[in-house]
Amino acid sequence: MALAIGDTAPDFEAETTEGKIHFHDWIGNNWVVLFSHPKDFTPVCTTELGTMARLKPEFDKRGVKIIGLSVDPVDNHKKWAADIKDVVGFAPNYPMIGDTDLNISKLYGMLPASTSGTSEGRTPADNMTVRNVFIIGPDKKVKLVLVYPMTTGRNFDEVLRVIDSLQLTAKHRVATPANWKQGEDVILTGAVTDDEAKKLYPQGWKTPKPYIRVVPQPRQ
């Protein structure tokens, strides 16, 4: 069954390129991006993992840990790293899970629970549903789920934008409008009364419609 926003991210133990982890312990009190790819040594995935490595400093600045996953063995992940660096200029600098028994992929709803066997002999097409992004909060709750098709590489700048929004709205009773970026105006949520808003934003707010109150982004 697919995970939904607000669900507790399932816990698991796994072998990674940086050793064995217990997922919830590994999360600690951090935000986390768990992202999966269909298969090692494939073209789109090569660009994705290299791009994620290039952007890792941006995730670090936000206090976000990143971890990759595929059903390939950890040894394959390690061998593939040189190719990724050759193509993109950056090798994975984050742990990558080897989900060879498919258990985590099934636990997170990326493969049907009825899927049998192991990763051996599986093709990228067999794993076509395993190109997901899960953003998980420090409370271990799922905050966002993205599922991409085989032929479309992910936009990790958008993942960073969503994290900026999630972290801001976790601290302040605001929401972010379409295409919002860090530093731009935000919208007060309905939970904030006008009397409260006057105290929080004495300079006032813009009201293009009675149900829309636009204010400057609060300081984090």
Please give the residue ranges for each predicted region.
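Chalcogenol-based redox active-site neighborhoods
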Residues: M1-Q220
